[in-house]
């Protein structure tokens, strides 16, 4: 968590607090799919976020989905306050016994990506930009951990807007 907080703070230029917002995710479990509906988690996050938080990122170790996709690495409220990232599919070893060499790096990239959406950043066509949409772990590995020039400008503009 410390590495994640440091990287998020570096990209967004803000102080980071860590803690638990939601303990039990069973309310979002779809029994038929044996996956967790990420939109339901977002709704709870937004409702339970402390007032003094600008944004809230949840890191979940469960398999997330939205109804139109088989799985998602994360989901965010575009321009909102909440986002969630799943670590479940970012590790080649689902057993948790063998951690993929790039596991932490993938979590950091997806966390920054989802937080970017909360700052109104859309998916970017630049394959190296952290805001590029990823279909699989290889896509996550291929993109950098940085915003492209265009997305960086958009983020700076959004942060300025939020400060006024």
Task: Show the residue positions of the predicted features.
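Metzincin-family zinc-dependent endopeptidase catalytic domain
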Residues: 1-111, 122
């Amino acid at each position: 968590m410390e590495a994640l907080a440091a990287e998020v703070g570096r990209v967004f230029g803000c102080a980071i607090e860590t803690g638990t917002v939601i303990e039990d995710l069973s309310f979002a479990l779809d029994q038929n799919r044996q996956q967790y509906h990420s939109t339901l988690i977002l709704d709870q996050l937004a409702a339970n976020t402390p007032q003094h938080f600008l944004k809230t990122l949840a890191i979940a170790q469960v398999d997330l989905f939205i109804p139109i996709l088989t799985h998602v690495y994360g989901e965010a409220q575009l321009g909102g306050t909440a986002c969630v990232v799943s670590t479940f599919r970012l590790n080649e070893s689902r057993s948790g016994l063998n951690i993929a060499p790039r596991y932490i790096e993938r979590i950091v990239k997806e966390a920054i990506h989802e937080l970017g959406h909360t700052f109104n950043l859309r998916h970017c066509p630049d394959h190296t930009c952290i805001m590029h949409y990823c279909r699989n772990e290889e896509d996550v590995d291929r993109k950098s951990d940085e915003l492209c020039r265009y997305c960086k400008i958009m983020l700076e503009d959004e942060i300025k807007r939020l400060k006024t």
